[in-house]
Design a protein with these regions (language model features):
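Bacterial N-terminal signal peptides
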Residues: 10-20
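Low-complexity, acidic/polar, glycine-enriched regions of mature
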Residues: 22-250
Length: 250
């Protein structure tokens, strides 16, 4: 009986308590995505076209205030929605304002550093907090062989191929760049596109956008339990709301 009870509790946590985004479409789910730092996004100028010519490199810094990278996963059935914050990651962006299509962006995320259901993230999303022991249990399943499989694959990577300036501006009115590149997850690499709203000056950069991927594109199924009574949706929303600083001399 204890094992059955434990199984049910785990299902409630991973699929978890409430109706979440059950019945919503991917478009509706995207409207529910959370950007932590909407109010502080501006850093000084309106876009890359205002900068002096020449290549420059910025490094994204997870240690900077309001620099967040996380994954949102919505429930497909009974259960709550999940937020998984990346606590160990790094990335960079290099571009020349006169040759934006030649930009180079890379981001590497440590799977071991993915921390689910942190208090500040659940507060941000307006969801009830999860106990420490329950978070640990969710983290264990997230790293499991049927999910991210940490034992075999310790990083998630994105590397750009090209960039293009969009005719549309982002939600904050800043220039939007569509970054085409390759994403590697669980050892599988797929071509993806990442629309990024970018504010930048000579010393700092802020970028925010959502990369949408699907479990099945990378060879695994969304977490499911009790015959699908508790199940996550196929879509994985990698939310970037990040800050960076220019590399001295570059």
């Amino acid at each position: 009986m204890r094992n059955q009870s434990s199984l049910f509790v785990t299902a409630m946590l991973l699929g978890a308590v409430g109706l979440g985004a059950c019945g919503t479409t991917p478009a509706e789910d995207r409207d529910r995505l959370t950007f932590p730092a909407r109010q502080d996004f501006p850093v000084g100028v309106r876009g890359a076209d205002t900068l002096s010519p020449g290549s420059r490199t910025y490094t994204f810094n997870p240690g900077l205030e309001n620099s967040h990278l996380f994954v949102q996963i919505f429930s497909a059935s009974l259960g709550h929605d999940h937020v998984v914050r990346a606590t160990d990651w790094y990335g960079s962006i290099r571009f020349d304002p006169a040759k934006l299509e030649g930009c180079a962006i890379s981001v590497t995320v440590s799977v071991e550093g993915l921390d689910p259901e942190r208090d500040e993230m659940r507060d941000l999303m307006g969801q009830d907090r999860v106990s420490r022991s329950d978070r640990d249990q969710i983290r264990e399943h997230l790293r499991g062989e049927d999910q991210l499989d940490l034992a075999k694959y310790d990083t998630i990577q994105f590397t750009s191929r090209s960039c293009e300036l969009s005719s549309e501006r982002g939600a904050g009115g800043y220039a939007q760049v569509v970054v085409h590149g390759d994403m590697t997850l669980r050892g599988s690499t797929r071509e993806v596109s990442l629309p990024l709203e970018v504010a930048v000056d000579e010393e700092r950069v802020a970028a925010r956008g959502v990369l949408t991927a699907r479990h099945q594109d990378f060879g695994f199924e969304p977490y499911s339990m009790l015959g699908g009574l508790f199940k996550n949706k196929d879509e994985l929303y990698f939310v970037m709301d990040v800050r960076g600083e220019r590399v001295p001399g570059k």
